[in-house]
Amino acid sequence: MAALWILLASFLFSLMGAAVKLASNEYSVAEIVFYRGLVGIILLYLFIRHQGGKLRTEHLPGHLWRGGIGVVSLWMWFYAATKLPLATAVTFNYMSPIWTAVAMIGFAWWQGKERIALPLLAAIAVSFGGVMLALRPAFEAQQWFGALMALLSGVLAAVAYTMVRRLSRAGEPEYRVVFYFLAVNIAAGAAGSLLPGGSPDGAAWHAHSLRGASLLLFIGASGVFAQMALTRAWRTGKVLVVANLQYTGIVFSSVWGILIWHDVFDWHVWLGMALILASSVAATFYNTLTEKRAAAARADST
């Protein structure tokens, strides 16, 4: 059942990305972030009330840090989705396991450990080779800044995932983590809309059309439902199965790009995306195996 939950989450996240790209014709990225948080928090609050959950927390600073890093990552990814082909933006954003691997190697080097895992080095090398192949059209079309934002969003997403795990270990339920994240979305989106330069045309807020309002509602609803499905998958499924099946989001996004925007990629772009996908799966496998070994070692020492 967990496999179905992660497939549903990946499908909904890909639809959300497509809706963000469509909505960018009528709204700024700041507005989309704001409404994503507003619609999502209303739906989530109704769910929490129905389930009898509580929002009071003793870990507010942790939630704010996670929310701040998460919303910057989300903002960068939304921006990238408006500038790049959807599949390319999603692929770069899904590189979190690679950045985690880079951090693990950097930490090992900092601690003076002589042995550095060769599988991780290989995965990192292959992934960056894939990035160079996939980035070529972006540089030719002067889309390098959007590509940079997509890559950085993946870096911050890796940090945000680490903070989510820490909050979970502290006893915070996932709905509470998501609620405070959405609250930060609202605050950041509102602030970004009011700042000078928040919108390309200078307008802080744009009037709603039926199409625009429908897209915003869909972005908020699909985002929160995808998050809940993802949570259920991680809670009930095996780590490796869930982690690897989430990459189906790249496939779904490729389909939307072809159907809606008629995206056509050269062979080297497809090869680059495949290399990134394969190396991310390998890094996920190795990272998970390393965490299991570390947990077993801690259990044996107690």
Go through the PLM ranges and name each one:
Residues 1-2, 27-72, 99-103, 126, ...:
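Transmembrane alpha-helices of multi-pass small-molecule transport proteins
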Residues 1-9, 49-78, 145-153, 203-225, ...:
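Loop-to-transmembrane-helix transition segments
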Residues 1-31, 125, 141-166, 296-302:
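Glycine-/small-residue-enriched transmembrane alpha-helix faces in small-molecule transporters
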Residues 44, 138-201, 207-208, 299-302:
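Transmembrane alpha-helical segments that form core, pore/gating elements
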Residues 79-82, 97-119, 251-270:
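C-terminal transmembrane-helix exit sites in multi-pass transporters
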Residues 89-95, 171-184, 224-259:
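Helix-helix packing/entry segments at the starts of transmembrane helices
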Residues 102, 116-136, 268-287:
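Hydrophobic transmembrane alpha-helices of multi-pass small-molecule transport proteins
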Residues 247-302:
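C-terminal-most transmembrane helix of multi-pass membrane proteins
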